From Swiss-Prot:
GO molecular-function term, one example from the UniProt record: fatty-acyl-CoA binding
Transcription regulation keyword on record: no
Compartments (UniProt record): Cytoplasm
KW Transport (keyword) present: yes
GO biological process: acyl-CoA metabolic process; fatty acid metabolic process; spermatogenesis
Physiological role: May be involved in the energy metabolism of the mature sperm.
Listed GO CC annotations: cytoplasm
Protein's UniProt name: Diazepam-binding inhibitor-like 5
Tissue specificity comment: Testis.
Residue numbers binding an acyl-CoA: 29-33, 55, 74
Length: 87
C-alpha cells in the first residue's frame, strides 16, 4: 500500500458513475480525512448544521486510527464501490 495507490483510489472515486448513499459518502469521507489529516482536530459544529455535524461525527469514529490503516480501508472501500457499480 502506498501513497500512489491512495491517490489512485481518490481519483477512481471521482469517476464512479452512480450516486453514493449518504452513508457511503460519510464513510469514505471519514477515512479520507483520517488518512490525510489524522485525528479530528476541529471543534464540534453546531447541531443546527446537520451536514457538518454528520461529517464531524463520522471522522471522530476513526479517532486513534493510524493514517496508514485509514488509507488501506479507504482504498478497499473505493474498490468495493467500483465492484458494486459493475454489478
Amino acid at each position: 500500500m502506498s501513497q500512489v495507490e491512495f491517490e489512485m483510489a481518490c481519483a477512481s472515486l471521482k469517476q464512479l458513475k452512480g450516486p453514493l448513499s449518504d452513508q457511503e459518502k460519510l464513510l469514505v469521507y471519514s477515512f479520507y480525512k483520517q488518512a490525510t489529516q489524522g485525528d479530528c482536530n476541529i471543534p464540534v459544529p453546531p447541531a443546527t448544521d446537520v451536514k457538518a455535524k454528520a461529517k464531524w461525527e463520522a471522522w471522530m469514529v476513526n479517532k486513534g486510527m493510524s493514517k496508514m490503516d485509514a488509507m488501506r480501508i479507504y482504498i478497499a472501500k473505493v474498490e468495493e464501490l467500483k465492484k458494486n457499480e459493475t454489478c
